[in-house]
A protein has these predicted regions:
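N-terminal, positively charged nucleic-acid-binding surface of large information/translation enzymes
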Residues: 1-182
Length: 182
């Protein structure tokens, strides 16, 4: 049986799900159902990224710990999919023909990511170094040099100067193999 991998964008549970969340998941669900009808073994995933400054600030504003805050918001996403008639199973459960919902704070997910990063670092594909730049918490993105030195070039909110240690993946090491493959 042919395999088909499909994923929605990963959602940030700093607020309730919205029409954009519903739209992208419904479109992917339609495609997953179609591919199953065509005989594909479909792996259909979605989930929440439960880390970051935006989450910490939203939790603090709500008077909750980040873990309490995201647990409540995660349930809203799952309920939305159920209301839309999309069969969903929350990680690590995996029901056949369902949308697998994975969240980044699940201990199994954290262990898997740690194993992957350790292996990549051992092979020289990940290194740790200091990064300095302007960051927009609202958009959760670093801002390119050469734009407004004070505000985010997308939302217009003030950007923060950030200096921190980060891990960098050497994607350039895979450029030629990827070009050869595709």
């Amino acid at each position: 049986m042919k395999k088909f991998y499909l994923t929605t964008p990963i959602y940030y549970p700093n607020a309730r799900p919205h029409v954009g969340s519903a739209y992208t998941t419904v479109v992917c669900d339609v495609l997953a159902r179609y591919k199953r009808m065509c005989g594909y073994d479909v792996a259909f995933l979605t989930g929440t990224d439960e880390h970051g400054e935006k989450i910490e600030r939203a939790a603090a504003a709500a008077g909750q710990s980040p873990s309490q805050f995201v647990a409540e918001k995660r349930k809203l996403f799952v309920r939305l999919w159920e209301k839309l008639g999309i069969p969903v199973s929350v990680y690590p459960e995996g029901k056949p023909d369902s949308l697998r919902f994975i969240y980044t704070t699940h201990p199994d997910h954290e262990k898997s990511v740690q194993r992957l990063l350790v292996r990549a670092r051992e092979r020289g594909f990940v290194d740790k170094r200091r990064y300095e730049g302007r960051y927009c918490v609202s958009d959760e993105r670093y801002i390119s040099e050469g734009t407004d030195p004070v505000n985010c070039d997308i939302c217009g909110r003030p950007a923060e100067l950030v200096s921190e240690e980060n891990y960098f993946f050497k994607l350039s090491a895979f450029q030629q193999p990827l070009l050869d493959y595709y």
